[in-house]
Amino acid sequence: METSKSSTMQVSFVCQRCSQPLKLDTSFKILDKVTMQELTAPLVTTAAVKPGDIQEVDSNIEETFAENRTDGVSRRLIPPARMMSTESATSFTLIGEASDGGTMENLSRRLKVTGDLFDIMSGQTDVDHPLCEECTDTLLDQLDTQLNITENECQNYKRCLEILERMNEDDKEKLEAKLKELAEDEERLIQELEEVERNRELVAKDIEKVREEAERLEQEEARYQKEYSEFKRQQLELDDDLKSVENQMRYAQIQLDKLKKTNVFNATFHIWHSGQFGTINNFRLGRLPSVPVEWNEINAAWGQTVLLLHALANKMGLQFQRYRLVPFGNHSYLESLTDKSKELPLYCSGGLRFFWDNKFDHAMVAFLDCVQQFKEEVEKGDTGFCLPYRMDVDKGKIEDTGGSGGSYSIKTQFNSEEQWTKALKFMLTNLKWGLAWVSSQFYNK
């Protein structure tokens, strides 16, 4: 039973360098008083050890070990010799039953002695104990290196001492004469140094005056430099402003020249074609069964067309008869001059109402009438002017005079989408010719 109790006791020391747990050698269990005196003796003895010192060490070893018998756990801390705090970096814990008083007391005493031994060893050297085997080997290597260095120094001192001992009396006299000569040189050099020091003081005063003058000049230079920098900054700002104004004028002149060469009508109204569709500003005018163009796009194209004819008429000073063009985006319309309340919409939303309401057809025929009036007005001043497609306002048709010779209705009722789309394409082509004539008459000049 006692053996099992003893086997439960655990002691743990840690290495003071790497903090790894240590397993102590069995020789620590049989330390006697003579061995303790040998281990704790100083490495270099400068005086005889008094008997009282041995008794003091022995009394430290016999210091009472603190044990808590209520929980069977005894604790002891081993502080390093160079630690200012009373807490230790080395500690161990005894775990066992307090009922076995003799075994616990002997073990506690041995551990206390071991801990005190480590404290004493740490105090005798510059190394904290205990150490593990690897750290001990490293320490031994360092000590060997220091020992070799010390031995080399000792050999050098011995050689110097031997050289001094071999010197004879003549050498001593020569050295004394040399020493006297050096003393005279020293006295002479001291006098020269004093003279140089006096000259240095005079030069220092001159330097101080020159330094004051230099400071004054530096202040004036700094003030002039500051003023120069300010004027330079203002000059750079004015140069930047001047360059900016010149660049703005140059850019404005370039834009002015470009605008002078720009035809407003050509830049604003781009008439072209996309397949079978005539387009104005990329809006398709017309519909096909295979390409059902949205009515919003068709209405927008009509709005651009009305705006173009309205602008051309204003440029020529033309007043249309019977109708007045009202450009209003994708809701543009014509206003009857004979009946002010009658509006002819040039927009449509499709559906069943589109097939029964003929206002949209009347509006397109009225617009064709306005195009015809524009053509006649141009022909008054230029008899050589001719549109590529002849327009029959009474029938609401446009004839392909230069091609198949057929005529195409501009109305949607009782008409196919293909013919209606082709009629609109021919109408846009006539407007493109009218646009080119107005541009040549009013802008190229």
From Swiss-Prot:
Q: How does it sit in the membrane?
A: Peripheral membrane protein
Coiled coil region boundaries: 137-264
Q: Where is the motif (BH3)?
A: 103-122
- According to the record, the residues making up region (Required for membrane-association) are 420-445
Q: Which Pfam families match?
A: APG6, APG6_N, BH3
Record's keyword terms, sorted? Antiviral defense, Autophagy, Cell cycle, Cell division, Coiled coil, Cytoplasm, Cytoplasmic vesicle, Endoplasmic reticulum, Endosome, Golgi apparatus, Membrane, Mitochondrion
Q: Which portions of the sequence form the region Evolutionary conserved domain (ECD)?
A: 240-445
Which GO cellular component terms are attached? autophagosome; endoplasmic reticulum membrane; endosome membrane; Golgi apparatus; mitochondrial membrane; phagophore assembly site; phosphatidylinositol 3-kinase complex, class III, type I; phosphatidylinositol 3-kinase complex, class III, type II
InterPro entries, alphabetically?
Atg6/Beclin, Atg6/Beclin_C_sf, Atg6/beclin_CC, Atg6_BARA, BH3_dom
Posttranslational modification, per the record?
May be proteolytically processed by caspases; the C-terminal fragment(s) may induce apoptosis.
Coarse class of the protein's main subcellular location: cytoplasm
In alphabetical order, the GO MF annotations are: phosphatidylinositol 3-kinase binding; protein-macromolecule adaptor activity
Where does it reside? Cytoplasm; Golgi apparatus, trans-Golgi network membrane; Endosome membrane; Endoplasmic reticulum membrane
Q: Which GO terms fall under biological process for this protein?
A: autophagosome assembly; autophagy; cell division; cellular response to nitrogen starvation; defense response to virus; early endosome to late endosome transport; late endosome to vacuole transport; mitophagy
Quaternary structure note: Component of the PI3K (PI3KC3/PI3K-III/class III phosphatidylinositol 3-kinase) complex.
The job of this chain, per UniProt, is described as:
Plays a central role in autophagy. Acts as core subunit of different PI3K complex forms that mediate formation of phosphatidylinositol 3-phosphate and are believed to play a role in multiple membrane trafficking pathways: PI3KC3-C1 is involved in initiation of autophagosomes and PI3KC3-C2 in maturation of autophagosomes and endocytosis. Involved in regulation of degradative endocytic trafficking and required for the abscission step in cytokinesis, probably in the context of PI3KC3-C2. Essential for the formation of PI3KC3-C2 but not PI3KC3-C1 PI3K complex forms.
**Which protein family is it in?**
Belongs to the beclin family.
Q: What is this protein called?
A: Beclin-1
This protein's gene is called: becn1
